[in-house]
Amino acid sequence: MPRKGPVAKRDVLPDPMYNSKLVTRLINKMMVDGKKGKSQTILYNAFDIVSERTGKEPMEVFEQALKNIMPVLEVRARRVGGANYQVPVEVRPERRTTLGLRWLVNYARLRGEKTMEERLANEILDAANNAGASVKKREDTHKMAEANKAFAHYRW
């Protein structure tokens, strides 16, 4: 913890093409070794693939996909009397978005398609249709929270 008061939250600038801070955050999540331009190109090409396949605005599809990925509940470890309990807690809005973006990028990277653009586009499309690995991750997280409901009174 910092000694000089709370750390100021840094705000990202909206991206040039879609004028969205959410897209900028996704670009930053995808970025490897500081290559932001490369990350931007990959995302925009993935959005082009999404709009080709669906005929809809890629931002609409992306927002729907993110909505389907973002968790509402998660479990956090709490130590009580020598035992660790998995306590279900509600996820703050900022963390929900962060987890959604992180899972989207991570599971897109694990897919089998040839290029990252195809992987990302397909993961976005799957998530928008409530399928895919990132949606499964959310379901697993919710199942864990549901299974540990008995420890909800340990919430802090």
Swiss-Prot record:
Key words, A-Z: Ribonucleoprotein, Ribosomal protein, RNA-binding, rRNA-binding, tRNA-binding
InterPro entries named among the record's database cross-references: Ribosomal_uS7, Ribosomal_uS7_bac/org-type, Ribosomal_uS7_CS, Ribosomal_uS7_dom, Ribosomal_uS7_dom_sf
Entry-linked PROSITE patterns: RIBOSOMAL_S7
Any single GO CC term annotated in Swiss-Prot or TrEMBL for this entry: small ribosomal subunit
A GO MF label: structural constituent of ribosome
CDD domains per the UniProt record, alphabetical: uS7_Bacteria (cd14869)
Record field: transmembrane: none
An annotated GO BP: translation
Family per record: Belongs to the universal ribosomal protein uS7 family.
UniProt subunit comment: Part of the 30S ribosomal subunit. Contacts proteins S9 and S11.
HAMAP family named in the record: Ribosomal_uS7_B
Role noted for this protein: One of the primary rRNA binding proteins, it binds directly to 16S rRNA where it nucleates assembly of the head domain of the 30S subunit. Is located at the subunit interface close to the decoding center, probably blocks exit of the E-site tRNA.
Entry protein name: Small ribosomal subunit protein uS7
The organism of origin for this protein: Bacillus anthracis
Recorded name of the encoding gene: rpsG
